[in-house]
UniProtKB/Swiss-Prot annotation:
Enzyme class per UniProt: hydrolase
Function: Endonuclease that specifically degrades the RNA of RNA-DNA hybrids.
Protein name listed in UniProt: Ribonuclease HII
Record-linked Gene3D superfamilies: Ribonuclease H-like superfamily/Ribonuclease H (3.30.420.10)
Cofactor: Mn(2+); Mg(2+)
Main subcellular location of this protein, as a coarse class: cytoplasm
Chain positions recorded as a divalent metal cation binding sites: D31, E32, D124
Length: 213
């Protein structure tokens, strides 16, 4: 018997948690954007959805066009509670990208807690940050399973894309508004031609090998 492909994120995880644990009244989804780029911060978001007022068309950010992500970004901010956190390039280089991503997630949940009490977090990926201020559960490929995580993925992605578009204005040779800092051929060529900027991650190999020894 062939298994059907997962139809996309839904509220099964959220509803199961709310049913099984009466101590959980409010839960958030958490995701990050920007682990792979050669430059710019890593950004995380934590989102508590209003289960009775979900944004129409909510899906994993990777399945959406840039225009649809922008539309949903605005809808999520109107209908939901949102916290955003980031880790800087300096923190990425000092900690490594994994630990910097965990730090950004902790900051996002902490920011969200400034708005309301959060009892539980659904974290995209295979680990829960050690210093997360609330109990958490890791969900592998969570942005394709949980609508709360999918919403967080959209907030994190659009927030970071906007940051890279701003940086692109100061450093137009690198094409960051288009590539978001990922190691595209055009970005690598510009890096070799124009050099390393203060926004590049010096611990990442394509950048590190261009630094003076």
């Amino acid at each position: 018997m062939r298994h059907k492909a997962h139809p996309g994120p839904d509220l099964e995880l959220e509803c199961a948690l709310l049913r099984s644990n009466r101590a959980i009244k409010t839960l958030c989804g958490v995701d990050e954007a920007g682990r792979g780029p050669l430059c710019g911060p890593v950004v995380a978001a934590a989102v508590v959805l209003d289960l009775d007022n979900l944004p129409v068309g909510l899906n994993d950010s990777k399945q959406l066009s840039a225009k649809k992500r922008e539309q949903l970004f605005e809808q999520i901010y109107v209908t939901s509670q949102v916290g955003v956190g980031e880790a800087s390039v300096a923190e990425i280089d000092a900690l490594n990208i994994l630990h910097a991503s965990m730090l950004a997630m902790v900051r996002a949940v902490t920011a969200l807690q400034g708005r309301l009490v959060v009892d539980h977090a659904l974290i995209d990926g295979n680990r829960v940050p050690a210093t997360l201020p609330v109990p958490g559960q890791a969900v592998v490929k969570g942005d394709a399973k949980s609508l709360s995580i999918a919403a967080a993925s959209i907030i994190a992605k659009v927030t970071r894309d906007r940051i890279m578009a701003e940086l692109d204005r100061d450093y137009p040779h690198y094409g960051w508004a288009k590539s978001q800092g990922y190691p595209t051929q055009a970005h690598l060529q510009a890096l070799a031609l124009h050099g390393v900027t203060p926004h590049h991650r010096r611990s990442f190999k394509p950048v590190k090998q261009l630094l003076p020894h």
